[in-house]
């Protein structure tokens, strides 16, 4: 099957998580007016432990054509990925309880100025870079036992 890749927007992505960006977002000034603070862009939710981690993940570019055959989810915490050098990347997401609901499977491409924060229990493809090696600032839950993986029928990403 082919899965159409759509431009990422908060409206289209809202069921799956938050788009982390400054475009069309409110801000206020701090530090004597020298800084615009774009406050509360995403909810970080962590259950059953007291440690939120900030990490850097260095992702390798995916091989083309890109096919998706598994999704993962994190039931105990949100997970955010923010590209550190303005790189475009692709996210694949789905809703569902015990298994991904393929009727909700969606793929999005960022504009290079966006990050994503997956809600708890949102199925998503593991992180990968798009065109070149990419460093991602990652915010998620520490500890183990927070990753479910499910195989899905193969999907080939289709770019307009």
Curated annotation (Swiss-Prot):
Gene3D superfamilies: Ureidoglycolate hydrolase. GO terms for molecular function: ureidoglycolate hydrolase activity; ureidoglycolate lyase activity. Induction: By glyoxylate and allantoin under anaerobic conditions and by glyoxylate under aerobic conditions. Its EC number is 4.3.2.3. Coiled coil: none annotated. It catalyses: (S)-ureidoglycolate = urea + glyoxylate. Pathway: Nitrogen metabolism; (S)-allantoin degradation. Its cofactor is Ni(2+). The keyword Cell cycle does not apply. It comes from the Bacteria. Keywords: Lyase, Purine metabolism. It holds the Pfam family Ureidogly_lyase. GO terms for biological process: allantoin catabolic process; purine nucleobase catabolic process. Homodimer. PANTHER family: UREIDOGLYCOLATE HYDROLASE, UREIDOGLYCOLATE LYASE. Belongs to the ureidoglycolate lyase family. Catalyzes the catabolism of the allantoin degradation intermediate (S)-ureidoglycolate, generating urea and glyoxylate. Involved in the anaerobic utilization of allantoin as sole nitrogen source. Reinforces the induction of genes involved in the degradation of allantoin and glyoxylate by producing glyoxylate. This is Ureidoglycolate lyase. It comes from Escherichia coli (strain K12).
């Amino acid at each position: 099957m082919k899965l159409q890749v759509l431009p990422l927007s908060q409206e289209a992505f809202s069921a799956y998580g938050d788009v982390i960006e400054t475009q069309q977002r409110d801000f206020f000034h701090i530090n004597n007016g020298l800084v615009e603070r774009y406050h509360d862009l995403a909810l970080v939710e962590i259950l059953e432990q007291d440690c939120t981690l900030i990490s850097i993940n260095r992702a390798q570019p995916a091989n083309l054509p890109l096919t998706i055959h598994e999704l993962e989810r994190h039931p105990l915490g949100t997970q955010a990925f923010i590209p550190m050098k303005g790189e475009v990347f692709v996210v694949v997401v789905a809703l569902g309880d015990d298994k991904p609901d393929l009727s909700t499977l969606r793929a999005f491409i960022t504009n290079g100025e966006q990050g994503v924060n997956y809600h708890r229990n949102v199925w998503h493809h593991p992180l990968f870079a798009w065109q070149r090696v990419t460093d991602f600032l990652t915010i998620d839950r520490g500890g183990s036992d927070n990753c479910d993986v499910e195989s899905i029928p193969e999907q080939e990403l289709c770019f307009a």
